[in-house]
Amino acid sequence: MEGEELIYHNIINEILVGYIKYYINDISEHELSPYQQQIKKILTYYDECLNKQVTITFSLTSVQEIKTQFTGVVTELFKDLINWGRICGFIVFSAKMAKYCKDANNHLESTVITTAYNFMKHNLLPWMISHGGQEEFLAFSLHSDMYSVIFNIKYFLSKFCNHMFFRSCVQLLRNCNLI
C-alpha cells in the first residue's frame, strides 16, 4: 500500500478495526491509541443504549451467511443517508456480530472484520473524508448528546428489525413452498 490508500487503511483501522478487536477482547484497553480510547467512549455508550433496547441475536455458521446478513442490514441502514451517528451504529453492529462469531467459536470473526472493513472502505470512507475525517468523527463522539444517540439507536434498530423481519417472512414463505 502506498500514499492515499495507506492513509485510508489507517483511518479504517483507527476507527473500526481497533474498536472491534477491543470489543471481542483481542486487544486490551491499554493497547488502544489515545484516539481509539476517545471514540471508544461514544461507541460504548451506543452499545449500552442498544443493549437496553433489544437483544440482537445472529444465526451465523458460514462466510456467506455473514456477508448476506451484514450487507443486508448495513445497506438498509445507509440507503438514504450517511451520518456520524449511523456510522457509530454500524461499528457497534459490526463489533456485536464479530463477538457473536468469536463466542460461538466458529472462527468467523475475521470474516466479519474483513466484511465491515470493505464496506467502510467502499461505501462510507468517501463520505467520512469529505466530512472532516477522523477529526470530525472525534468531535462528534466527544459532543454527542443523549438525544442524538437514542435517535440513531432507534433508527438503527428499525432498519435492523425491518431487515430481519423481511428475512424471516421470506424464510417462512420458502418453508411453506410458497416461493
From Swiss-Prot:
SS bond partners: none
GO annotation, cellular component aspect: host cell endoplasmic reticulum; host cell mitochondrion
Motif (BH1): 76-95
Compartment(s) of residence: Host mitochondrion; Host endoplasmic reticulum
Keywords: Apoptosis, Early protein, Host endoplasmic reticulum, Host mitochondrion, Host-virus interaction, Inhibition of host apoptosis by viral BCL2-like protein, Inhibition of host autophagy by virus, Late protein, Modulation of host cell apoptosis by virus
Molecular-function GO terms, alphabetical: BH domain binding
UniProt key word Glycoprotein: no
Ranges spanned by the short sequence motif BH2, renumbered to the chain: 126-141
BP-aspect Gene Ontology terms: regulation of apoptotic process; symbiont-mediated suppression of host apoptosis; symbiont-mediated suppression of host autophagy
Gene3D superfamilies xrefs: Blc2-like (1.10.437.10)
Matches recorded under SUPFAM superfamilies: Bcl-2 inhibitors of programmed cell death
Alphabetical list of InterPro entries matching this protein: Bcl-2-like_sf, Bcl-2_BH1-3, Bcl-2_fam, Bcl2-like, Bcl2_BH1_motif_CS, Bcl2_BH2_motif_CS
Domain of life: Viruses
Outcome (variant: residue 85 to A): Complete loss of apoptosis suppression
Pfam families, per the entry: Bcl-2 (PF00452)
Induction remark: Expressed in the early phase of the viral replicative cycle. Expressed in the late phase of the viral replicative cycle.
Quaternary structure, from the entry: Interacts with host BECN1 (via BH3 homology domain); this interaction allows the virus to inhibit BECN1, and thus autophagy. Interacts with host BID. Interacts with host BAX.
Family: Belongs to the Bcl-2 family.
Function: Suppresses apoptosis in host cell to promote the viral replication. Has the ability to potentially bind to all the members of the proapoptotic Bcl-2 family. Inhibits autophagy by interacting with host Beclin 1 (BECN1).
Protein name as catalogued: Apoptosis regulator Bcl-2 homolog
Lineage start: Viruses, Varidnaviria, Bamfordvirae, Nucleocytoviricota, Pokkesviricetes
